[in-house]
């Protein structure tokens, strides 16, 4: 705008000179007034060299710097929100002359990196360059029609769900629904998911998702062990289970000291009396459909629990496992409208009986009531979980796959029971038509057993047939040299079946078509296995079958939930930073979304190139030598990292090294993961400054020198401080024969400033859903890849179907086993982290760490006169997060962290992390992506709440009946005919002036947690039952 104004003035002067020659040419040459500031031009009198005459009056030399010609759509300035001017002002407010002086005072010099430089993308790609690069990678992936099956299927993702959930930041930037009052939308959707699972499996309890089918089966195996109180130590897996599931269970069994036996069903032997459980597949991995009724009766007669891995689409027409007698049912909801994505993310499930509900892993959504007596939803039975029970938890799982569970639930809502049955019958019909056609051809032999969607074929040369299919861009599953399976799905067409006939004809003419023989095909499902029980009878599954209706339902639920679209979510240790649109775009491109994880790797060269680049970049960032991308959650990464350490000790003959030292301040997943590895846990305390007590650690390490396996440590600490003694801590562990496992939860304060490898760690998992921008999705997906030093690289996990290992690959390989169902975990979301790292460049990503630290210190400074800041470093600064101490307020005003969090909802904010790592506190993490204005708004809200608390302390307002205890205040409460509160409706609703311009409203009053657990309901209830319960509690 300014440049245009100056050029216009220059034009007017030229025009005036034409009419008034008395104006001198030197008047036109005053750069300070009329020439663009982009020009280095200097003009003085008649000494100007004239390269070009301007209308005969004077002359001007204009040059443009090369810098000015570079693309302008750079990314770091879009991600890192504080401007250079704001950075200086904020640093000065904290007490430092500039940002770098603050960083120098905060990060210990002993571990500080001089600099970090990428080997690729060091300057950072612009957003348009990044999109072009990802399009180039996508072009290297080949999309073949998949008939591989094995738990992964093509699916038609309804576009209304794709656009309005998977691509919608209103859904994918939400956090796990800890604050139920501003999460009722996704809680309802997850309750829909649980209801869908319980209806289809025929069992009354389901969780709200697990990571994948293989790990869900391993969790079920652990449940069987717990149900039997650890007294029976053998678990039998039927050979008809998916190979990846078998390997995951074998790997997981080591930590529980379980013996896993793989056997044909006919050879199962319970005579030892030592079998805690069995796992079977329904339908089997090669398609066979068996009636397990008598098998299950026999298992139960021998005191053995039965786990059944099943397929949701098949269960729409097959007798449900619960009716067959199964105790636990697991599986994947992937084929309910979630792309294969080269392996994930997908929502798995686990269903069981009421009897075992408290042994279930994962999050469970339950129905409760709010303070007004109206029905409300919440996460139920949280006392089972790792953040409370630590090493005694049912599982280490926390982040699961909520976003994908929501997609699958909406798929069920959209199609309804009749729509799902139609899809299942069509898939079964296509498989039946294919089988009939092969019998008619006579070139191969078709299995005699009944099937649902997968046909098993015996042939002379399976490789030759697979190669013929390859020519038609079709992938088949080669079981062995004489066996092929062909799995059908909802995207298969009748034309595909005709093409398959040509493939299997082996040169013989095909004299019929699929359409011509289809009328002759009979149902292949035995009458005893045909489903008769109705399912999805609740109105929600029977009223949103047009796109308009589903769109409005999705939008209605979204409007109930606070996300990053509305305000910052300052949860400590959660790193709720920007999930940029450019990062998210490739996730839904078909070239990334529609590849089967077991497709030949030559069909996924774009993925493979990205994996290599990402592995190299993560090695640079962390100081490690190799990475595994297989762990598909942070907790899975912890488990994998500890198992790598155990494999290393075992390879050296140190089988006895099983002691793991963990600070009391560690996240609950740390002891839970160590327990899953069969480790003996020893805790060490912290000193008054929140640092690990080094002398106590030294004594513990020396006392267990012969048996020490590892230390688990988070850096910066969970107290939000860079511990000065971290290098000494690592040395103590190494001197006593142990390895250092670093929890990567706080990596956002390390990148570019220090690194786990530089500090002295041997292995570390990265939460890509924290530091590296994968969105939290309302409770998943996540990714937890692990980086290791060279000596641990040979032990990184592999896979039974597609062998994998470290990136870069080590010289030798002795993999520990299999951690996740897919070779590269949730590969579909890796482009998010990859694009973030590549666009930021080494300097931009380093600045992100610096600004995250600046923002935290700025907020701590603003709040310190109102709330005590619990821990600081040696120079009085905090890391990227800090802890506000509310403990004194319980005595002076009866206020606890939950009360402050609920009142923050009235101000339009999600509360910080409550009562962890210190009970009675709030932990705040702003991230680098929040603007100074947003930081100030949040600080203003907390300061205003402190003033409200002061009114309680002074006795001005009632100790128990006040605006904080009454929070949050939803519209229905504020608009009620009767108002009995001792404060005004206006003050309850609008405690800050900015709220009148825009306010996010909670949709329920404070939810009663105790009622929900005492009256556990985890599925949709008939509407009238909700009304009756509300009346009963009113």
Swiss-Prot record:
It catalyses: N(6)-[(R)-lipoyl]-L-lysyl-[glycine-cleavage complex H protein] + glycine + H(+) = N(6)-[(R)-S(8)-aminomethyldihydrolipoyl]-L-lysyl-[glycine-cleavage complex H protein] + CO2. Its EC number is 1.4.4.2. Residues 1-63 form a transit peptide. GO terms for biological process: glycine decarboxylation via glycine cleavage system. GO terms for molecular function: glycine binding; glycine dehydrogenase (decarboxylating) activity; pyridoxal phosphate binding. The modification N6-(pyridoxal phosphate)lysine is found at residue 770. Its main location: mitochondrion. It comes from the Eukaryota. One of its GO terms (cellular component) is chloroplast envelope. Keywords: Mitochondrion, Oxidoreductase, Pyridoxal phosphate, Transit peptide. It is found in: Mitochondrion. Disulfide bonds: none annotated. Its cofactor is pyridoxal 5'-phosphate. The glycine cleavage system catalyzes the degradation of glycine. The P protein binds the alpha-amino group of glycine through its pyridoxal phosphate cofactor; CO(2) is released and the remaining methylamine moiety is then transferred to the lipoamide cofactor of the H protein. Homodimer. The glycine cleavage system is composed of four proteins: P, T, L and H. Belongs to the GcvP family. This is Glycine dehydrogenase (decarboxylating), mitochondrial.
